[in-house]
Design a protein with these regions (language model features):
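Conserved core of the sugar-phosphate nucleotidyltransferase
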Residues: 113-217, 221-227, 247
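Ligand-binding loop in jelly-roll beta-barrel domains
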Residues: 393, 400-405, 413-443, 498
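Structural motif
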Residues: 148, 155, 311-312, 372, ...
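Conserved N-terminal catalytic core of the sugar/cofactor nucleotidyltransferase
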Residues: 1-5, 13-20, 28-104, 110-112, ...
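Residue-level signal for inorganic ion chemistry
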Residues: 36, 92, 108, 149, ...
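Left-handed beta-helix
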Residues: 193-386, 393-395, 400-409, 438, ...
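Short, well-ordered alpha-helical scaffold segment located
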Residues: 58, 109, 190-191, 263, ...
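Catalytic metal- and UDP-sugar-binding loop of GT-A-like glycosyltransferases, i.e.
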Residues: 6, 105, 387, 432
């Protein structure tokens, strides 16, 4: 089964933890993993390939975070002009064979419970019979932020957009209403045929768009020009509301849509809870993501406080969602705070801003294994690099040399330079830039005659082939069981399976 992950959200709802350049689906939320990574981990037992649909500007973040999965088969579908879930799901599904099962999930949900497996297995049974299947969640409370569906047993009667529940007295939990989780399971051909019959415009424009793109490694880019004729809208509005005989599986697992900061746990990976002190507070939530700051609250109630290195958000819990309007109304003046955070992903690694003031800027630079910066130079600043982790292969002018931990190098203004990582571990450098102008635009890339100026130029060949390390891809901790065959679908003639080992040719495999 293939898994299409929708990961194109903009990040306003969780400000200041998430920003436009680093939205919530990429934040470390649980056990050091982001919501995107948690979504992948959750579905690895059921899916053999992942198709991640996201904005073009998030390409480097996705590829950077997917390096955590060294033997995983995945593809990134980039939307130059996002048009809603209908286009995203159609474009992603076109990369699957028509007979293959496709499981659509979103990258901003938290899910717990063994019942997740049961829901997927039941949905697969229905999908194999030709149905498009939604996963519905029994409402725990009235919530105007979610879409609903009305069902009769496993039959979907209608989809309902987000509604003002206080204004709709006819709504009742006993009437067969379920939250629409945004998760769907179907055979690729069944969805494509439904689109052709119900919304020919969506079918035709998505099919033409796919014909116009070229795959580079595992990345497919649909430019704004290619996507301009694709209709805007949700998959529910354009297809599912008009679909006959759609099925739904009511789920019993714990499901949480991370819609605002109140949906987070104060003790999650995003917060340093040891640096929070509450005194005489009632129903107060404090999330402190700044590891060098103490947050103290005193004699307040029904309030949420979110503290980061460069911004603080304080709101009543009732009005916490107002942040979207606040950002929209004040974006021009405070764009740097609303849109950007201190971490930025590149094709070759990560930049993290540590400190900045007039005349200097300090960054932590991480270069991924087997990656290299482009050769470049700066006209307005000099740089001082200190290697604090790994072995960096640094080019200065015409000279290339390896620098080890605790060794440093000075890069004068105008000097051509780059860093490459020819090892199988991250290289970490502390970079200090000095100059009157420290803009990211002060960079002149220098390509070789053989270069085509694409991200492919950022790959280097390792000096030594790394040792291949293998671990069980699937493991049944209860030795003597049949879980690997009955649950994960492993093909094996033995009655008892303890471990299953998989060999991968994935370029990041170890």
């Amino acid at each position: 089964m293939k898994c299409v992950i929708l990961a194109g959200g903009s990040g306003d709802s969780l400000w200041p933890l998430s920003r436009k350049n680093y939205p919530k689906q990429f934040m470390n939320i649980k056990e050091g993993r982001s919501l995107l990574q948690e979504t992948v981990v959750r579905n690895m037992p059921f899916c053999d390939e992942f198709i991640i649909v996201t904005k073009e500007s998030y390409r480097n973040i996705v590829n950077g975070q997917m390096k955590a999965f060294q033997s995983l088969k995945y593809r990134v579908v980039l939307e130059g002009s996002p048009k809603g879930t209908a286009a995203a799901i159609m474009l992603g599904s076109q990369f699957c064979n028509q007979s293959e099962l496709v499981f659509v999930v979103t990258a901003d949900n938290l899910i717990e419970g063994q019942e997740y497996k049961d829901a997927i297995l039941r949905a697969k049974e229905l999908a194999k019979q030709g149905s498009i299947v939604a996963l519905g969640v029994k409402p725990a409370k009235k919530n105007s932020n979610f879409g609903y569906l009305l069902r009769d047993e496993e039959n979907v009667l209608k989809f309902i957009e987000k509604i003002r529940l206080d204004d709709d007295e006819s709504f009742g939990y006993d009437d067969g209403f379920l939250w629409n989780s945004g998760m769907f399971l179907y055979r690729a051909g069944d969805l494509i045929n439904a689109a052709r019959a119900i919304c020919p415009e969506l079918y035709d424009t998505c099919r033409m768009a796919k014909r116009k793109v070229a795959a580079i490694r595992r990345t497919v880019r649909f430019s704004q020009k290619i996507m301009k004729d694709i209709p805007q809208g949700s998959i529910e509005r354009l297809i599912f509301e008009k679909l006959k005989d759609m099925k739904v599986v009511e789920t019993a697992f714990r499901w949480k849509d991370v819609g605002n900061v109140c949906d987070l746990d104060e003790n999650s990976s995003v917060s340093h809870s040891e640096n929070v002190l509450k005194n005489h507070c009632e129903d107060v939530m404090v999330i402190n993501s700044a590891d060098r700051q103490l947050v103290v609250t005193n004699d307040i109630q029904d309030v949420v406080v979110v503290n980061t290195e460069d911004a603080v958000y304080v709101s009543s819990k009732e009005r916490v969602d107002d942040i979207k309007n606040i950002i929209s109304e004040n974006k021009e003046k405070y764009e740097n705070y609303f849109d950007y955070n201190r971490i930025s992903y590149r094709e070759w690694g990560i930049h993290e801003l540590l400190n900045a003031s007039d005349g200097y800027k300090v960054k932590k630079v991480t270069v991924f294994p087997g990656m290299s910066m482009n050769l470049h130079q700066h006209e307005m600043r000099s740089e001082h690099w200190s290697v604090v982790e790994g072995t960096a292969t640094i080019t200065l002018g015409t000279e290339t040399k390896d620098y080890h931990k605790y060794e440093s190098v000075f890069v004068p203004i105008g000097m051509k330079h780059k860093v490459a990582n020819k090892t199988d571990k991250n290289v970490v450098i502390i970079e200090v830039g000095i100059g009157e102008i420290l803009s990211e635009s002060d960079m002149v890339k220098i390509y070789s005659q053989e270069s085509d100026g694409t991200a492919e130029d950022n790959y280097v060949k390792a000096a030594n082939e790394p040792v291949v390390k293998l671990d069980p891809a699937f493991k049944d901790n209860l030795w003597g069981g049949t879980k690997l065959r009955t649950v994960f679908g492993k093909k094996c003639d033995y009655d008892v399976i303890g471990e299953s080992w998989e060999l991968s040719a994935h370029p990041d495999g170890q």
